[in-house]
Design a protein with these regions (language model features):
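Cysteine/selenocysteine-centered motifs that mediate thiol-based redox chemistry or coordinate metal-sulfur cofactors
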Residues: 35, 60-61
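Phosphate/pyrophosphate-binding loops at sites that engage ATP/ADP/AMP, CoA/4′-phosphopantetheine
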Residues: 54-60
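Helix-start/capping segments and mature chain N-termini
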Residues: 1-54, 71-134
């Protein structure tokens, strides 16, 4: 889905039973982005519950990230463990601001070019524009 016309949000899932951190804000921002991109879909709490019913259990103490991506044809849902950040890493400063930063869009072609040569576990890109880290 990357590099298609669409939007995404990443929600932290924590605890047992699972809690979706800042759920309302994520839903609001995702729907606002979809409207700006002229994608005729709105993710409601009801649709969210239908999509994820029976996928979470109270037996697990969650520390995960739930990514929801939407374009004109597909709704993609991905749950992955939240990794602990490495305190020691090498940063590559890149003077770049993604297109339309007010929305979390799926157009990451330029950023992927910066990521290709990096060893992802030890090296990170740090985006900046006009002397501000983004």
């Amino acid at each position: 889905m990357w590099n298609t016309k669409g939007a995404f949000t990443t929600i932290r899932v924590a605890g047992s039973p699972p809690k979706f951190i800042f759920f309302k804000e994520h839903l609001l921002n995702l729907n606002k982005s979809l409207k700006i991109l002229n994608i005729d879909f709105r993710l409601t709490k009801k649709i969210f519950n239908i999509l994820l019913s029976n996928n979470f259990t109270n037996d697990i103490k969650y520390n995960h990230l739930l990514r929801i991506a939407v374009n004109n044809k597909i709704i993609s849902i991905d749950l992955r463990k939240r990794s602990n950040p490495n305190k020691f890493f090498k940063g590559l400063l890149v003077n770049y601001q993604r297109t339309r930063p007010e929305i979390k869009n799926l157009n990451y072609k330029k950023i992927f070019q910066f990521l290709k040569p990096l060893k992802i576990n030890f090296e990170k890109i740090i985006l900046y524009k006009k002397n501000f880290i983004l």
